[in-house]
């Protein structure tokens, strides 16, 4: 019998005169701190031991001599009992126990407190969001960096996962398939040091964000928490060398990112939420770049957390995209939002398109709800509006056409008559970037008298903000279709049509469409001012003015525009959906992407 590995002879398992069988261990050899069993290749009687314990052996060196004439022909059974698949070894039991103490079941008081406030735990939110059984957790055994202050047993009990539950999962896989359903989830745990960002959970976050960047994995983040954790132990000075915020920002435009906010979300937690494509917040949310302690420390006054950035402030100012009742609804909306970026759905219902003929009033000065047009034009119950209370004159929504995701921008004539103000331009421009980044075609429903003018408008930096729509549209690569519902005047109409009536893949109008370089009343007063002033009789002057305006309206009718080929067609409103579907069918499919199309999606 020869050695099969170089090393030191540790022990003999047989002695001269013993009978051995093939496969029986005859000696132990140690190499590189590991023990190797030397097995007999055949049976027989041991005649001599050829090495002493402690000797260093070379590979293939003879160890003992066997007389094969005494081989009984039986293989060695190993002397092992049948394995019990349910037996838990002590080393595994320790690991199992460490994992168990991170679960909600091991923390009944913390869970009960959370539930008493009408809130879910971090693990409950993730469990409800992801597909059943799909979640694998990274860094579950992490502990807070407070080892000089707290004993390990205390850290295990008080800082499970260091306050950040994170890992990989799928969402909506049954609908879109596992590849499209890939998702990274990260949830700050408010029951652990108020969801603050500790040294170790920063490292965990950085690890996962780097993985999301490498493998292009969409991210959903529950951002509730108080920002940095000042009582953690850090061997450096500032902790400003962490990569967390850079890591999340690098995902912008590469993969969809969603922040869900509930309760208090301040400082670093809020900064991460602000880097995401969309913020979904519950009605109990307060969201700000600093909490009360930091505000007071800066000498800026004393406030309660709920006074800093409540939903009543952060929804109309555009910070929050979607407001929901509670965390359960937030999960459902996040699942739905992710679906628009995962693909088409097979089940859809088209509303009765004939209703579109009656949604824009015959009286041209009567306002209407453009959201009713959106609900009727696109698949039934498929719309999800973003930032509805911010810049309400500009509607931005995700919807579907025969199951295919599309983005919708639309003027709402109930607000400023559909005029585009600075906030509305920002809202539309950012939404264009979002849709283009992820290959979602855009549909523009135009009904605008132009952009907002006047000294008050200029105080909002309209010149710069309004121009964002031109810049964003000029960089689009996705299909862009325009339907003019009624008004299409001046630069506002050009902004809604990607810079020009001829820029979109098609520009069509409903019969109610009216067009001009500016509002006709103003154009007549500007162009015929001297002629009108020369008419002494006020009644005659008004009649001449009204006649000039009527002629301008006649020239600006949609039919006349189409006759001059400034429109692709004037269509029956009931035919709009067919136009959009045929337009989409005529466009090439976007090429598979290995990286991002756009440098990033603007935070604003």
PLM regions: where:
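Ligand-binding clefts of soluble mixed alpha/beta catalytic domains
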Residues: 74-604
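Short hydrophobic beta/alpha edge segments that flank linear recognition/processing sites
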Residues: 18-39, 57-72
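C-terminal, active-site-flanking charged/polar segments
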Residues: 45-48, 53-65, 503-507, 584-587
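Generic structural motif
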Residues: 2-9, 40-51, 57
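Methionine-biased hydrophobic packing positions in alpha-helices, especially
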Residues: 5, 32-34, 496
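Acidic, low-complexity mobile loops and tails
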Residues: 1-27
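Conserved, short, structured surface segments that act as functional micro-motifs
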Residues: 39-40, 49, 65-81, 224
């Amino acid at each position: 019998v020869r050695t099969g590995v170089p090393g030191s002879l540790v022990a003999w398992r047989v002695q001269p005169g013993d009978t051995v069988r093939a496969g029986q261990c005859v000696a132990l050899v140690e190499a590189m701190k590991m023990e190797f069993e030397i097995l007999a290749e055949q049976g027989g009687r041991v005649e001599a031991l050829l090495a002493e314990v402690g000797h260093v052996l070379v590979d293939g060196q003879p160890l003992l001599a066997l007389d094969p004439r005494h081989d009984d022909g039986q293989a060695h059974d190993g002397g092992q009992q049948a394995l019990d698949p349910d037996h838990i070894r002590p080393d595994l039991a320790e690991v199992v126990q460490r994992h168990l103490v991170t679960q909600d079941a091991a923390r009944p008081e913390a869970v009960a407190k959370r539930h008493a406030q009408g809130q879910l735990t971090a693990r409950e939110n993730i469990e409800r969001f992801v597909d059943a059984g799909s979640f694998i957790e990274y860094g579950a055994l992490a502990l807070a960096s407070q080892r000089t202050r707290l004993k390990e047993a205390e850290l295990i009990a008080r800082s499970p996962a260091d306050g950040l539950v994170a890992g990989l999962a799928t969402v909506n896989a049954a609908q879109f398939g596992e590849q499209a359903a890939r998702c990274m989830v990260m949830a700050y745990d408010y029951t652990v040091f108020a969801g603050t960002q500790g040294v170790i959970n920063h490292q965990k976050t950085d690890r996962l964000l780097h993985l999301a960047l490498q493998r292009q994995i969409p991210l959903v983040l529950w951002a509730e928490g108080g920002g940095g954790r000042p009582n953690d132990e850090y061997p450096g000075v500032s902790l400003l060398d962490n990569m967390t915020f850079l890591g999340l920002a690098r995902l912008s435009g590469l993969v969809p990112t969603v922040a869900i906010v509930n309760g208090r979300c301040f400082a670093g937690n809020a900064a991460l939420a602000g880097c995401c494509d969309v913020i979904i917040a519950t009605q109990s949310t307060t969201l700000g770049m600093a909490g009360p302690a930091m505000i007071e420390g800066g000498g800026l006054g004393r406030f309660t957390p709920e006074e800093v950035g409540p939903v009543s402030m952060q929804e109309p100012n555009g910070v929050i995209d979607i407001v929901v009742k509670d965390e359960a609804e937030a999960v459902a909306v996040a699942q739905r939002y992710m679906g628009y970026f995962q693909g088409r759905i097979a089940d859809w219902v088209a509303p009765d398109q004939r209703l579109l003929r009656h949604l824009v009033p015959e009286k041209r000065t009567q306002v209407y709800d453009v959201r009713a047009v959106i609900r009727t034009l696109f698949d039934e119950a498929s719309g999800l509006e973003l930032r509805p209370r911010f810049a309400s004159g500009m509607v931005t929504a995700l919807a579907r056409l025969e199951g295919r995701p599309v983005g919708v921008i639309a003027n709402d004539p109930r607000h400023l008559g559909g005029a585009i103000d600075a906030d509305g331009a920002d809202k539309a421009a950012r939404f264009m970037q979002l849709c283009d980044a992820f290959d979602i075609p855009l549909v523009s429903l135009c009904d605008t008298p132009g952009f907002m003018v006047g000294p008050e408008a200029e105080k909002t930096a309209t010149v710069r903000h309004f121009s964002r729509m031109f810049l964003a549209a000029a960089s689009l690569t996705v299909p862009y279709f325009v339907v003019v519902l009624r008004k299409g005047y001046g630069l506002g109409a050009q902004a809604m049509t990607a810079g020009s009536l001829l820029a979109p893949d098609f520009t069509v109008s409903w019969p109610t469409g009216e067009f001009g370089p500016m509002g006709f009343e103003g154009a007549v007063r500007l162009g015929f001012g001297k002629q009108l002033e020369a008419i002494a009789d006020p009644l005659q002057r008004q009649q001449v003015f009204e006649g000039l305006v009527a002629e301008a309206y006649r020239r600006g009718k949609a039919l006349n525009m189409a006759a001059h080929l400034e429109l692709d067609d004037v269509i029956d409103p009931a035919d709009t959906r067919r136009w959009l579907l045929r337009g989409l069918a005529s466009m090439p499919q976007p090429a598979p992407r290995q990286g991002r199309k756009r440098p990033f999606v603007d935070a604003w």
